[in-house]
Amino acid sequence: MKRQQSGFTLIELVMVIVLIGVLAAVAIPKFVDLGSDARAAAAAGVAGGLASAAAVNYAARKANAAKGAIVDDCQDVAGLLQGGLPAGYEITSLAITADATVTCTVTGPNTTTATFVATGIS
């Protein structure tokens, strides 16, 4: 009486191990590089906060000239944030005339940059 043997051959097992190795070699660099994605997201978050602060300030000052702050340079927007600009971030200086809209650049740690829109108000 012959017994039926079942299972994987050595070649099948080696092929599976090789395939797992190739997949790991492709996937691991993506997980290692998540730091740059996090820095870009942080800079974009700061830029979003700056854009919101600039828009709220513009609306408040248009409604009542005694409220809000004068914005005639991109760097003035940093003063509109509660607590100021986070440590390690800086805004590139760019003049803004009254009622003009410009695109400003904020630079974060490791030279990560993001842009935001600001409108000048006097």
Map each language-model feature to its residues.
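Short, intrinsically disordered low-complexity segments
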Residues: 1-2, 29, 60, 66
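N-terminal single-pass transmembrane signal-anchor helix
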Residues: 2-31, 35
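Aliphatic-rich helix starts adjacent to a transmembrane/signal segment
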Residues: 4-5, 32-46, 61
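Low-complexity, intrinsically disordered short peptide segments enriched in small/polar/basic residues
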Residues: 8-11, 15, 25, 43, ...
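Short alpha-helical interface patches
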Residues: 20, 36-42, 74-82
